Amino acid sequence: MMQTGGATAGPVAMAASCVLLGARGVLIRGASGSGKSTLAWSLIREPRPFAFARLVCDDQVLVEAQDGRLLASPVAAIAGRIEIRGLGIVPLAHEPLARIGLLADLTPANDIPRLPQPDDLRSELLGVALPRLAVPMRNPLAAALVLHAMSHLAAGGDLADFSGDDVRV
């Protein structure tokens, strides 16, 4: 699937949601029903400390490696729509493209290491290595965890040196 120059043969559709926070996107992955849409909605509604947050796509995302970066874009048929449990599928402003800065993997809480190793905090997708955060699924603090991690990364930090003192609200 990889071509020379660090680009895939074309976009790959994957079951995920993506939100742009400031200048970088969060690719939210997880099993069906794990809370991807809920986390995306929470990040968009309360994006502090980021001044800007917008949906890229919900449920299905087109992902492509290009020049060592991972890019996400919406599937045309569902662009600008998000599923909000209890309300259904609703329209929402969206961005056409995001450079992914964090992989947020919704995971059962018991499967998340209490003290992650450095290798737990990085993952490779389509040949691009990225920071990875295991996020407890269906947890009310999930959005805060993602926002704090993204803020730390935006300031030039690495998840391996993340500190609670880094949190800015």
Each PLM stretch: what is its role?
Residues 15-22:
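P-loop NTPase catalytic core of nucleic-acid-dependent motor ATPases
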